[in-house]
Amino acid sequence: MSKSKVLLVGAAGETGGSIVNGLLDDGNFDVIALIRPGSIQKTSITRLVDKGIQIRKCDLKASEEHLIEALADIDVIISCVGPAEQQDQIPLAKAAKKTGVKRFVPCGFITICPPGGIMWLRDEKEIVYNQIRQLWLPYTIVDVGWWYQLAYPRLESGCIDYAMTSGNDEIVGDGNMPTALTDLRDIGRYMARIISDPRTLNKKVLAYNLVSTQNKIHELMEELSEEKIVRNYVPEETICSRMVAARQASETYPFDPRKFIPRYMAEYQFSCGIRGDNNPEYAKYLGYHTTQDLYPDFKPTDFREYLESVIRGTAVGIYQDRIISRKHQRHFPRTGSSDSLYTRIFPRTESSDSLMSR
């Protein structure tokens, strides 16, 4: 039986990297990465080649003719583009329709949230989803909740700074809002099942490992680390004020993706921490299938064990090429072990490609 040919857009990003690993480990897929011609020499692309990933050179902004050529003999497309590039997927979807792609997985991979003005990023994605449906292109939309890797607070000792992307020192509202969590590394394992499953064709799927709250996560971190964590509760009024200010600051011309980062943060906090959107029960209400219902035999990474690895110093940090902006540095007490924390968050390059890659 021949393997399914999967074309991955954004294979060098965090989500894309997880999917690469999950598909390769499964063994039933030929994995091909669509790479911009100008990015071929990057170290991250060399690492893909070393894993045995085939490379096809094409830019999402290329002509339809070139996109169609790049999609020759592809069965499944999985897109992991950055927030600023969501609508660049539309020409790719049109080319996929013309080449007979059997399943298109657009770039979802965020928390649960209904469209219509709550999260700019959600609304950008929904524009793409609607275009796909208008094309009558077979699709699967996958969202993944909030990553383990972004869910835990900083410890005062600085011993886990090496693995952190930000201080994560705020508890939204009363801290008791349930939210779906997923280990980034499990996303690829879920995707190997989802794209092989006829039940998920033309459906929405929430892939998640467990449901927890910020308060419970703080308590667990205190138990495991034997350190006291100061609770910094941020009321709904403050979150809403930030969101309004961030929206006003971001709505400028020309489009500047850097101005949207405070907006993403505020809107995520509002949706997940105040509204409680990122909940499997709400996802089902919105029409999602869940991986816990679809794949009851799936063994997810245990959250407690993951946090133990973070505290031991054996976890792997994410967004290793990012640096924290000067604006955000003041939120991090500088200790001997936290200097490396300043190498996270925003990219060293000013290009929107690296800034917004997922």
Identify the meaning behind each predicted range.
Residues 1-29, 38-52, 64-65, 97, ...:
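Eukaryotic N-terminal targeting leaders
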Residues 2-46, 61-64, 84-87, 99, ...:
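Oxidoreductase cofactor-interface core, primarily capturing Rossmann-like NAD(P)-dependent enzymes
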Residues 53-74:
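Conserved Rossmann-fold cofactor-binding substructure of NAD(P)-dependent oxidoreductases
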Residues 68, 184-192, 300-308:
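Short, amphipathic alpha-helical "lid/cap" segments that border enzyme active or binding sites
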Residues 71, 75-79, 105:
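N-terminal Rossmann-like NAD(P) cofactor-binding module of classical short-chain dehydrogenase/reductase
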Residues 82-83, 311:
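Short glycine-/small-residue-rich Rossmann-like dinucleotide-binding loops
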Residues 238-328, 332, 337, 346, ...:
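A hydrophobic C-terminal alpha-helical subdomain
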